[in-house]
């Protein structure tokens, strides 16, 4: 039962998935706000979120991009439904587009977005390197990616550091430049955010 519940965070389904969406909306608020601040979003930016969950960050980014466009992709039909309800007006106006799908391949053309981000979803990607390659493909030259992970499985700060170093390595491996890492103390354990430029 516990394994089934935990698996819902990777791919929320059914009534348990709807409950998980409520939890994610509460738990990810601070991580979302921090990630969005690192992105330095401009009013005309084209922004993509991978693994948008209940759609809170999509909603916030839409407010920051009155002359731009916001897209999101998530594996879970339950999360797509919740996020679509939360962002209904922006979807109707064409400002926001939400789709069900995986991080690889991304259903967008090359050089589409100025900013791409993921909050607590990369750890569930089936192939992180392929996913990051896709992120780089859809980013415009000079575009920015921010990947935020709070490794809840880590028992020590040393384990968090391993996650951070791996994230930096992966960003560099697929060709991102000016890769840097930021950390933030968000209970119960340190959150890491890796940023790179195409």
Go through each PLM region and give its residues.
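Class I SAM-dependent methyltransferase SAM/SAH-binding core
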Residues: 46-105
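A short SAM/SAH-binding and catalytic strip from SAM-dependent methyltransferases
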Residues: 115-127
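Conserved alpha-helix/loop element of class I SAM-dependent methyltransferases that forms part
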Residues: 26-45
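N-terminal, positively charged/glycine-rich alpha-helical extensions of SAM-dependent methyltransferases
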Residues: 1-16
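A short acidic, Gly/Pro-enriched loop at the edge of an enzyme's catalytic core
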Residues: 104-115
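Conserved beta-strand signature within the Rossmann-like core of class I S-adenosyl-L-methionine
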Residues: 142-150
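Core SAM-dependent methyltransferase catalytic element
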Residues: 185-198
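A short glycine-rich, Lys/Arg-flanked "PGG" loop and its adjoining helix->strand segment in the class I
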Residues: 129-141
């Amino acid at each position: 039962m516990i394994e089934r519940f935990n698996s819902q965070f990777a791919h929320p389904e059914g009534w348990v998935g709807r409950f998980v969406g409520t939890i994610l909306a509460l738990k990810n608020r601070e991580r979302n706000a921090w990630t969005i601040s690192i992105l330095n979003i401009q009013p005309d930016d084209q922004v993509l979120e991978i693994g948008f969950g209940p759609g809170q960050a999509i909603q916030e980014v839409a407010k920051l991009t009155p002359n731009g466009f916001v897209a999101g992709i998530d594996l879970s039909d339950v999360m797509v439904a919740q996020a679509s309800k939360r962002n209904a007006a922006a979807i109707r106006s064409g400002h926001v587009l939400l789709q069900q799908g995986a991080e690889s391949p991304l259903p967008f053309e090359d050089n589409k977005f100025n900013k791409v981000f993921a909050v607590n979803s990369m750890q569930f990607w089936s192939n992180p390197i392929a996913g990051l390659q896709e992120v780089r493909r859809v980013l415009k030259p000079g575009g920015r990616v921010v990947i935020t992970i709070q490794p809840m499985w880590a028992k020590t700060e040393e384990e968090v550091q391993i996650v951070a170093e791996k994230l930096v390595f992966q960003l560099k491996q697929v060709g991102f430049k000016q890769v840097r890492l930021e950390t933030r103390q968000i209970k119960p354990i340190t959150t890491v955010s890796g940023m790179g430029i195409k």
